[in-house]
Amino acid sequence: MDWKERVVDEKAQLDDRLKKLISFQSTGAFTSLPVDQIKWLNRQRMVMELYSDILAERLALA
């Protein structure tokens, strides 16, 4: 498996996890979390989105 295939797989896994996090954020379970946990999950989402964008840019330049 070459590096592009690994990046494609990594992005697919990341995007799947990101989709699940976004879905969780629209539930009552998320809104009932302590404020600090909500803050950290929101930051996690932002970083995951940035990471996904970086992987997409790497693939676009390949």
For the regions a language model picked out, list residue spans one by one.
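Extended, charge-rich alpha-helical interface modules
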Residues: 1-62
